[in-house]
Amino acid sequence: SDGSIWFTDPPYGIIHGKRIGGYPGKMQYGGCYVFKYDPMTNSIEAIVTDMDRPNGIALSKDETHLMISNSGDVKYLRRYEIDKNLKLSNPIEFARQNPKNVFDGFRFDFEDNLWTSCGESVVCYNTSGKQIDVIEMPERVILSTLMICTNRCS
């Protein structure tokens, strides 16, 4: 709500030897990071540098938590607390998936449950990281970006 923009910069589209669209090239810096743009200073800062493939990202409704997915060798969701100065702390592994499934697009609903695409299904986790629902797709699809448009989300 303060105008900050939080984003990930995975290498998809430039990495070689993968069946991913885009234009192969070199990474412009030493890794895949999570960044925050500060509109007050017009600056960008790498705020998470220890994930191998940060990908999906979402803020909780009250903007006190940031959720980030890792789509590298180990697939997991990591949750951070956000303090009043917009600094991250207390990272926890929120949920983990098997190597075939990737958390990608996700969003919090009004009850702060997290709905995420995950392999060939949509999975819902409560605030404790417990899986509380799963929606299996009727046929084989690859879910990537997930947009949730229901009366459960704002």
Each language-model region and where it sits:
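A short loop-to-beta-strand structural motif that recurs across blades of beta-propeller domains
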Residues: 32-35, 76-78, 121-123
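A short beta-strand motif characteristic of beta-propeller blades
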Residues: 42-49, 90-96, 130-135
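A conserved acidic, glycine/proline-rich C-terminal tail/linker
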Residues: 119-141
